[in-house]
Amino acid sequence: MTKQSADSNAKSGVTAEICHWASNLATDDIPSDVLERAKYLILDGIACAWVGARVPWSEKYVQATMSFEPPGACRVIGYGQKLGPVAAAMTNSAFIQATELDDYHSEAPLHSASIVLPAVFAASEVLAEQGKTISGIDVILAAIVGFESGPRIGKAIYGSDLLNNGWHCGAVYGAPAGALATGKLLGLTPDSMEDALGIACTQACGLMSAQYGGMVKRVQHGFAARNGLLGGLLAYGGYEAMKGVLERSYGGFLKMFTKGNGREPPYKEEEVVAGLGSFWHTFTIRIKLYACCGLVHGPVEAIEKLQRRYPELLNRANLSNIRHVYVQLSTASNSHCGWIPEERPISSIAGQMSVAYILAVQLVDQQCLLAQFSEFDDNLERPEVWDLARKVTPSHSEEFDQDGNCLSAGRVRIEFNDGSSVTETVEKPLGVKEPMPNERILHKYRTLAGSVTDESRVKEIEDLVLSLDRLTDITPLLELLNCPVKSPLV
């Protein structure tokens, strides 16, 4: 028997272990505060889906998809229409990611809700078509499996390393998270869960060059949701894949996505299962307050602090006195966002990914929300924003690479024409040092959801999600999510 054959029969690897954990996870295994937190993460994902459903690039995605996809049984959030499960999952994921307001992980960058919720919702509707009822606790358990597995698999390949090398990391290690969440919802055995994982992992991909223009970055986490859902549904139907996909020495997920990274060891297999059942990544999923890449939230918060400290100095009327803005970033942030836009007009997605443009709009508007990146009325062509963006110089600081939770850190120094300067450092932005309070997430939900639908529906969804653990059938929730919404930009 060859070594590879022996490996294929082994049941002791980390793939088997995390699949066994996911398949057998029960409510009693999970602390009550984790169960409660999961509901608020679901609520945040729903808010982002609603507010993202009718922005121009989402409408274009729906228009293109509807032109070739037949109707199906799975609801499209905010449109009153249905598609097949794979198409619905991709579409709903594109909505959650559409505005850069959705959650992120500060050590292993990915956007969990945009992967987990679309896959789990679609899988639940597949089961409903078969006459099966899915409860709220079924959804919570599946979501927690996704919330817990994505960051662990990401950390096994050094979190942001993929991002530094040009991969859209969340689209890569989000695929197995989507498969595990889907598999949990479908009730897969540990063996079938491994099949789902293998099918998802062999499709994993995502190029970060998508950040420089176009619309496709908005749906790349949708590829992960699709891959995970497809893996789960095929495994549910008895389709088989390789076992031990994560740790295989030839063609395995961890091996292939760490080639050439210069690390020793190149990957940390043990991270896949580290702290399962005792440490909960559900609490390390970060909530965004700014509509831009999470890796630059530290610099944005630093500018905010300076604006509060020096209101006259940084008043909009006095911004012409700024000679230069220096910003120091972590390796991940500098690789991803430390670039100066050269082409005008900039696209919305490029604006949300460029630290120079992001800090410029924060200085001009004293906020960094969806409106700052709207493509309407020449908003992205404002001369005062461009003048400031070209005064920003990003650089790397090794100081921010020492702690995985400092990937979003930033030090900003603003230099004025008279030679004076002001400086502020934020190592861990709000929600990183300590989890964002649930009450703050609820406020964000109400604000975003209230901008696109009526108050009564906002309240209905809120009540259903926050009592999800007591909901015997999630159909009423999915029906409400399907109701048409309006654009937040008009």
Swiss-Prot record:
Subunit text: Homodimer.
Protein name, as recorded: Cis-aconitate decarboxylase
Physiological role: Involved in the production of itaconic acid, a soluble unsaturated dicarboxylic acid mainly produced from sugars.
Family membership noted in the UniProt record: Belongs to the PrpD family.
MF-aspect GO terms: aconitate decarboxylase activity; protein homodimerization activity
Subcellular location: Mitochondrion
pH dependence (UniProt free text): Optimum pH is 6.0.
GO cellular component: mitochondrion
Enzyme Commission identifier(s): 4.1.1.6
Taxonomic superkingdom: Eukaryota
